[in-house]
């Protein structure tokens, strides 16, 4: 376990490699095609959630909070961008664990992981995560007049909620 100043090598070991371990996410996405799929939908929805991180559960909370805001607007999350701000004395193993966890969450929820950025500051005491979820409005929830219809959940449907 290494502690100390954040460096390029630490970024490669703790951020890039855990993402590459998840093969589907390591392939990335077709730069022009997938962006076009998101942008050509009728209504784009963007949501952001920021929190301090002390455990993996905090990452899940930020992830689902951003995704649920898109869902609350009758949308479907397609892409997630994540930004970390680490204290200077962060443990590399903790950084790697959290980065791998966000990649696993994206794979579990069938959401593309678009961009992961990280920075270091002497002004933060705990890690800070910012999750930006991008999605589009789901047309299945509107009728011909554009008014919302009340839909009931089917058996076996998954509903995720975060406070």
Model regions: which residues?
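Hydrophobic/aromatic ligand-binding patch that stacks against planar heteroaromatic rings
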Residues: 69, 105, 151
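Glycine/charge-rich, flexible interdomain linkers and switch-proximal surface loops
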Residues: 119-125
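Phosphate/diphosphate-binding glycine-rich loops and adjacent basic-rich segments that engage nucleotide
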Residues: 131-163
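Extreme N-terminal cap/leader segments of soluble proteins
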Residues: 1-55, 82-85, 97, 101-117, ...
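Active-site cofactor/substrate anionic-group-binding motifs, chiefly glycine-
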Residues: 39-77
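Glycine-rich, proline-tolerant flexible connector loops at the mouths of alpha/beta enzymes
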Residues: 84-92
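Short, charged beta->alpha transition segments
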Residues: 33-37, 63-72, 117-119, 146
């Amino acid at each position: 376990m290494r502690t100390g100043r954040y460096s390029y090598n630490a970024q490669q070991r703790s951020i890039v490699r855990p993402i590459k371990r998840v093969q589907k996410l390591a392939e990335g996405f077709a730069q022009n095609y997938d962006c076009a799929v998101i942008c050509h939908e009728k209504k784009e929805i963007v949501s952001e959630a920021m929190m301090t991180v002390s455990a993996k559960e905090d990452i899940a909370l930020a992830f689902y909070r951003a995704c649920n805001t898109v869902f609350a607007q009758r949308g479907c999350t397609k892409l997630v961008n994540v930004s970390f701000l680490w204290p200077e004395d962060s443990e590399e193993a903790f950084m790697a664990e959290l980065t791998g966890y966000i990649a696993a969450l994206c794979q579990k929820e069938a959401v593309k992981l678009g961009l992961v950025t990280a920075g270091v500051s002497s002004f933060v005491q705990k890690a800070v995560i910012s999750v930006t979820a991008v999605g589009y409005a789901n047309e299945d929830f509107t009728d011909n007049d554009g008014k919302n219809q009340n839909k009931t959940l089917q058996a076996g449907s998954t509903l995720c909620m975060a406070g």
